[in-house]
């Protein structure tokens, strides 16, 4: 082969290699654009809320500054805080760290009743810092027989205790009376929080209070009392348990609750209660599709409830959510599942 032919062959191979590299780069950039073209959309990262990233869900037990630095690194613009009794002395530090890093304190989990001195003290903290997180309120812990064992409870013991509390909660009072009692309790919190510019939302957790029909009944009762701005926080992680299963009729349920929902917290859905990442479960895809097609607009929370290092948990939740968002927009465009698919005992998986 002549020198000229060698040069021609080398030039051809180089051009072919460039085409391969450029093609690979083009496909990667196209995938990236697909993931980011919905910026400003429902599943966009700037619409997400980091939730349940405090200990014990964060194995690294980060303090306020470390925690907020982590959120900033991951790109979160909104944060919902899960307080514990021992954290009250760190509330100021938490809020100040969020302000330094430009992250919005969107919500604050609130277990307290209006007559609890800590409730007013917490609101005074918000006033001092000029922040207005929405209070995510679940069932009252007042009167609940919550044991405080010296040692850790096993997973089975925790499960049995939770089931016991759920059953007791269901039989507290006749339905009409229970709705009135809960509406009165929430109304007291609304009145306490209103002078501080703070609003309230019902948080579906467990038991009677965590069932959507009951929460809607409470909201409607509040409307009769002249209270019209109480919303609902809907949690995928509490969409089903041994007492109910929202996934069986979610499209119909969503039509009912959509007008009240202010935030949806996303996770992977499993019938056995195991915590899995978005895209690993059996129902989150259909539920997200129902929500998206309904035109609902609100914040979307990602939960580090799975445990371990909260940063890694949130990263994996972002990966799973991004994959689902692409699949919702262009079925098949997301590529392989980012995590192993987990099926229930019947082998069910819906996408």
Language-model features: locations:
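Conserved beta-strand positions in the central sheet of alpha/beta enzyme cores
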Residues: 80, 106-107, 134-136, 201, ...
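Acidic-and-aromatic substrate-binding clefts and catalytic sites of carbohydrate-active enzymes
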Residues: 55-63, 79-93, 109-120, 142-147, ...
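Bacterial N-terminal signal peptides
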Residues: 10-22
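N-terminal pre-domain/capping segments
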Residues: 26, 31-133, 152-156, 227-229, ...
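Histidine-acidic metal/acid-base catalytic patches
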Residues: 31-49, 65-66, 155-163, 183, ...
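Active-site acidic/histidine proton-transfer and metal-coordination neighborhood
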Residues: 104-105, 112-232
